[in-house]
Regions:
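N-terminal catalytic or cofactor-binding beta/alpha core of small enzyme domains
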Residues: 1-174
Length: 174
């Protein structure tokens, strides 16, 4: 879907300013933060609508609680032999199990569907080979009716996500 309405695309001066003031500094700071041996995995976190939007082929389809992505298939494995994944499949599978255990009975945790990971995960994985996972969080977990953020639900969600990530790290660190 287009970002700008027809006839409202910014001119080259505005585009250059946006790149200089936001895009380049963001990616430089991110690369700098990863320029250490102490970072063992990185997460690119987003929120997703509870249902697919009308512009998608699967419009109205309920979305999972979490979508964990490494550019692979629905098991976290490469789409085809030799294709890029940004996190080892066994790690992504362990992370999915940990999230599913933490949110048992509340909904699905899936890998690479409806999202497979995007520019940030690929670009920054390629720089240092630090594993990257894109995490999509269903807004229904923390939004009340009318799209207002429920602060109590959000605080609980933070704790549970931390618990899921800690459980994952404990499992793969054994």
């Amino acid at each position: 879907a287009p970002i700008y309405r027809k006839g409202r695309t910014p001119d080259m001066e505005v585009i250059g300013s946006l790149l200089q003031n936001y895009y380049y500094p963001f990616h430089e700071r991110l690369a700098g933060a990863l320029n250490t041996d102490s970072i063992e995995i990185a997460f690119d976190c987003h929120s997703m609508l509870p249902h697919s939007p009308p512009v998608r082929m699967d419009a109205g389809r309920p979305r999972p609680l979490f979508c964990l992505s490494n550019r692979g298939d629905r098991n976290g494995k490469p789409q085809k032999p030799g294709s890029l994944v940004t996190c080892p499949p066994v790690w992504l599978q362990a992370l999915a199990r940990s999230f599913q255990a933490e949110f048992d009975g509340e909904g699905r945790v899936v890998m690479n569907d409806p999202f497979r990971g995007g520019f940030i995960t690929v670009a920054h994985y390629r720089q240092r080979r630090t594993p990257w996972v894109q995490v999509e969080i269903n807004r229904g977990l923390y939004e009340a009716e009318g799209r207002e953020v429920d602060e109590a639900r959000l605080a609980d969600l933070r704790e549970r996500i931390f618990s899921a990530v800690a459980g994952f790290w404990d499992e793969i660190s054994r």
